[in-house]
Amino acid sequence: MNRPSQISQDVAQPLSNQHETAMMSSDEDSMSRDSGICELMDENTPVCFSSMSTESTTVQVEECMEIDEDENLQPGPVSRRQKKVTFRREKSSCQVRLFDESPTSHKMFMRPQAPLSVRSENQQLLQQRKRKFEKSEQSSDHFHLEPMSVEAMDDDEIVMMDQNTTKWEPGFRAPNHKKGRLTRSATAFPSLETFEEEEHEEQHHLNVKYHLKTVAKESSKGFRRITAETLRDIFFRLSEKEFDDKYILIDCRYPYEYNRGHIKNAINHFDRVTVSKIFYDENGRKRCNKIPIFYCEFSQARGPKMAYALRQVDRELNVNHYPKCDYEEMYVLDLGYRNFFFAANEANITNLCQPHAYCEMHDKEHTMELKKYNFHNKGQSVLRTVSMSRSFKSLPTGSAFNFVASSASFTSAPSTSTENIDTNDDCQKSRTPAVPRIASRRNLFSDPSHSPTNFAQFPLTCSRETPSPHKHPLTCPRFS
């Protein structure tokens, strides 16, 4: 009876010792510093702990059967019964996740952005779940308007949607401003919209029908250019009275050029400020129904500028009736009077120029008179030109010599005498007076004889003078 119990105790004791050893080893492994998991642990490292997991260990225990002494059994191998003993212990499993961001960063607490898969049967439910927010109506001011509700998908639902679903558009959008665009039909039969757009374009632009033959190259939208042959044909086709009733020919050159030779029936006017007096009265009404033709020496500066000045006055008077103009059709003689004169001279036509001569603007005989005008300059000032013309008109007769003398005084050296100032009193009144410059000598030395520039006036008188060098060659007594 005692032997089986001892055997059972001997068997159970090593099993219990084995179990305790296994428990101690497992605890040492989990708390050991050599463990790879615990090496990554740190105080500031964010850790995601999973739920506690349980592990079961099965141990087989052999238990002996108790046999009574009274039972007559044959000796043989002892039959043993196996018993399963289950030990349960809790083991904490830790998972360490390292992040690049700082532990205090706001991204640590953000919702995970991993791609999520959605079942096809749940996609319909996601589409039904929608939230509403406010959106402004489309208008020019899209910041302060009454809100309107627009359905939009949730942010989480957008992530879970597959590629087969429709693309979500933002609720807020800038207003679309419709831009007017001119479209023209490329077919042989344009549409009605094309004609309406062309009529709308004609209302904002002045369309002029020129009846004379013009130069092919269009130089300006305000006027057109005609050749010398075209103007010559007009004189041959119309009489002098018919020409005056239909056209007005304006010579924009200076008076000395006009007097030496100009086209017949032409009037001289070079001031662009007073061009309105020719075509309009004091009340701003149109004087005549004539077609203006402008020209100058080359028709490059003075003639075209006069045409632009007339168009500017016309626009100012008809500002409420834009784009209507009183003088819509205007012409400029191409290449000017110079080309017209030589073309008529080659054709032996002498009755088109009165007198039949030509004077250049830079003629040497009229150099001083050219200084009165500067309308041919690109940077000319109208106010300065008007003031200069008035000052020259106020000069008395016989003051041409005084003007020449005063102009020569600007180029010559300043004079110290006051005789020229007294003789030019009349000229000084008509122009800006020039301050006379009188040269004065600087007395840098108390004694003028000490000045290095006055050696000729005050020769030096010294008792001891430096001996002059010998003019004969030097001789050495050794070689003499």
Curated annotation (Swiss-Prot):
Rhodanese domain span: 243-349
Domain of life of the source: Eukaryota
Reactions this protein catalyses: O-phospho-L-tyrosyl-[protein] + H2O = L-tyrosyl-[protein] + phosphate
Matching InterPro entries: MPI_Phosphatase (IPR000751), Rhodanese-like_dom (IPR001763), Rhodanese-like_dom_sf (IPR036873)
GO cellular component, one term: cytoplasm
EC number assigned by the record: 3.1.3.48
Positions of the UniProt region annotated as Disordered: 1-35, 411-452
Keywords: Cell cycle, Cell division, Hydrolase, Mitosis, Protein phosphatase
Annotated Pfam families: Rhodanese
Record field: compositional bias (Polar residues): 1-20
Keyword Cytoplasm found: no
Knocked-out gene: effects: Viable, but 85% of animals are sterile at 20 degrees Celsius. Reduced number of intestinal cells in 1.5-fold stage embryos due to defective intestinal divisions and binuleations at the 16E cell stage of embryonic development. Knockout with wee-1.3 RNAi suppresses the defect in intestinal cell divisions in the cdc-25.2 single mutant. RNAi-mediated knockdown causes abnormal male tail morphology; this phenotype is suppressed by simultaneous RNAi-mediated knockdown of wee-1.3.
Molecular function via GO: protein tyrosine phosphatase activity
Gene Ontology terms describing biological process: epidermal cell division; G2/M transition of mitotic cell cycle; nematode male tail tip morphogenesis; positive regulation of G2/M transition of mitotic cell cycle; positive regulation of G2/MI transition of meiotic cell cycle
Family: Belongs to the MPI phosphatase family.
Function: Required for intestinal cell division following the 16E cell stage of embryogenesis. Regulates intestinal cell divisions and binucleations probably by modulating the activity of the cell cycle regulator wee-1.3 and by activating the cdk-1/cyb-1 complex. Plays a role in male tail development, via regulation of the cell divisions of the ray precursor cell lineages, perhaps acting together with cell cycle regulators cyl-1, cdk-1, cyb-3, and cyd-1.
Protein name: M-phase inducer phosphatase cdc-25.2
Species annotation: Caenorhabditis elegans
Gene symbol of the encoding locus: cdc-25.2
